[in-house]
């Protein structure tokens, strides 16, 4: 099967990127090397092509009324020009996807628009789940990314760089805020969408824009000596920041409470959503497994599938693991039996036939300086 390619694919080739198959897309794993790319984001700025991710548009008169049932979070808790991290759940409270939902406000007359930026591997599942269960013709569902690029600039200098490129300030936009507007002095190809969000633990922007404009933005960033970054650095950055990766840390057999995302579930509001009955019971009965952070002694890295033990007893399994360039420690996420999940509890991780001591920590291993 032919792999999908971003409109920026030619830039990968020019930059001698190392390419891999990721969720059916041919994507860069690295450009100049994972450590250099990681440190560029932590110390100044770096940028990522994230066009493999999906963007779903929901349009209608008050679309929140019709789509609320897909999300455990109260959609009326955020308003036009804002984004919200949330989940799509199945009937048993399992996580179909984690995503950010954006309220773009009115676009044409009384028609409002919502954007969902979803994981690459889950786009088709998300799209069909919503379309097949919407049960109304009052809201249209479509792909908002056709022939466009999703580019992410991350790091403490990201806002300044973007302001220089567009020629105006974005200081009025709050964290998780967004805008959807024309920049006619840059492009006449259509509106740009951008938000103050990211997947690195740093200040950052995610920008949906026409292909030629994305090429121009790439060239501008390179001219400012900003490092293009691949999926390798994106993974180490997100794990340091304590952020989940769907397919490793989240899946349809795992609930928000087990994943440490119970704060996204609003049971106080009366709105119905898929999985509510199951989650109400689980919130009362408790969970059997829990996602925790681990710091592993030495330099051995606990990768996905490594088993976790306590006093020779198997208690869980690692879902994500890496060497942290920032903390200079081996870090990981693991699902373990809840009775062993207390902070600072010392466990053992089996790595290539040898056990290494590990300490249970909070999942965020890094927090940026304010």
From Swiss-Prot:
Cited Pfam families: GCV_T, GCV_T_C
GO cellular component term of the entry, any: glycine cleavage complex
Gene Ontology biological-process annotations: glycine decarboxylation via glycine cleavage system
EC number: 2.1.2.10
Cysteines engaged in disulfide bonds, as pairs: none
SUPFAM superfamilies: Aminomethyltransferase beta-barrel domain, Folate-binding domain
Gene Ontology terms, MF aspect: aminomethyltransferase activity; transaminase activity
Recorded catalytic activity of this chain's protein: N(6)-[(R)-S(8)-aminomethyldihydrolipoyl]-L-lysyl-[protein] + (6S)-5,6,7,8-tetrahydrofolate = N(6)-[(R)-dihydrolipoyl]-L-lysyl-[protein] + (6R)-5,10-methylene-5,6,7,8-tetrahydrofolate + NH4(+)
Function: The glycine cleavage system catalyzes the degradation of glycine.
NCBIfam families named among the record's database cross-references: gcvT, PRK00389.1
Family, similarity comment: Belongs to the GcvT family.
Record-given protein name: Aminomethyltransferase
Native source organism of the sequence: Prochlorococcus marinus (strain MIT 9515)
Name of encoding gene: gcvT
